[in-house]
Amino acid sequence: MKTTDVCPGTLASGFNTYSPLCLRKVFEGKKVSHIMDFSINDDTGGEIVASVNKISISGVQEKISAIIKKGKIIITPAGETGRYIIKPVPEYRNLRFRHNIPANEHLTMQIASQVYKINTAANALAFFADGNPFYITKRFDYKADGSKIKQEDFASIAGKTERNSGKDFKYSGSYEDIANLLKQNVSAWQVEM
């Protein structure tokens, strides 16, 4: 079992699980274990594939839909809407330091939030039953009542699709392209940049 002496969410010392502040920010005040009663292995592959196939979040890293049930993080059952996204250690074995990727993403988000006061998605680090870490983030595209908040990404604003821009259309833009789109579509674009 994975033990800790810091909050796996806020990284504050003196906690052996999530701190009250983390529980409020990430888990709506519910007491939640930082250890999942589940590990990714050959026996659980089907459950993972089913979850991955029903989530539509952009990006290249594997993402698994999750909910909180009885104080535990669990994979979203069929027919339910996930409120969290789990990002485990990538399966691609040639990635150097791949076991550090969940912690790196979490630390980066905490620096953005705590040091630079950037409004980020609520997030934490958690662990599978075998001790492997995963990054967990609360979905910001759903309201508390469960209704969906419509989101636009820059690929759709730019009119890019797989058909007109190729398979990797979401990743072919640049920051300059985004700045130009802001200038075209936002009256106070200087403030947004």
Give the location of each predicted region.
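Generic secondary-structure transition motif, activating predominantly at the C-termini of alpha-helices
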Residues: 26-31, 141, 158, 162, ...
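Exposed alpha-helical structural elements
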Residues: 22, 31-34, 153, 173-177
